[in-house]
Amino acid sequence: MQIILLERIEKLGAIGDEVTVKDGYARNFLLPNKKALRANEANRKVFEANRARIEAENAARRDEAQNESGNVEGKEVVLIRASSNAGQLYGSVSVRDISDALAEQGAKVTKSMIVLERPIKTIGVYDVRVSLHPEVSVTVKVNVARSPDEAELQSKGVNVIDAMFDNETGGFTEEYDPNAEPGEIPTELLEGGEEAAEA
């Protein structure tokens, strides 16, 4: 379907561009949300007549988003979640979790503004893009941890999972006797030492 864009849409175009999109995308998202018009002669005339007003409204929304970006840029949100010993979360972190955490810090962010490139399913620190306006994006840090102490370590740059495995294996050494027969237990490992071996 040919449409005329009423605002800049990522990976499609800018205001006034005529683009072709799939019918379902146009009918179910772009047209109902007033982000586009069907490309026909009547709508072209309506768009050209209102172009200055549409661009002025877009500029006002962009300026408002630019002002809000200072309030959101660089914020760090900490989300405490249950996870396995390997760091796999039981579930995942959703855009709603992130938007709620940002709202608690006073940011005016809706869940539709948060752009997750891929699902967050392990503990760690992630950079998440927040699109306040089609032309204004900022980055926030999302720190997913099992406890507040762990979150503090992660914010200092410590990889908690690697550190945990290093601690577990650091003191572990295996005694190995190359001359031992298979299935034979060395006498010094038996309880009671040599007396137990002689008995």
From Swiss-Prot:
GO BP term, pick one: translation
UniProt xrefs under Gene3D superfamilies: Ribosomal protein L9, C-terminal domain (3.10.430.100), Ribosomal protein L9, N-terminal domain (3.40.5.10)
GO molecular function, one term: structural constituent of ribosome
Cellular component terms (Gene Ontology): ribonucleoprotein complex; ribosome
Pfam families (alphabetical): Ribosomal_L9_C, Ribosomal_L9_N
Record family assignment: Belongs to the bacterial ribosomal protein bL9 family.
Function: Binds to the 23S rRNA.
UniProt name for this protein: Large ribosomal subunit protein bL9
Provenance organism: Novosphingobium aromaticivorans (strain ATCC 700278 / DSM 12444 / CCUG 56034 / CIP 105152 / NBRC 16084 / F199)
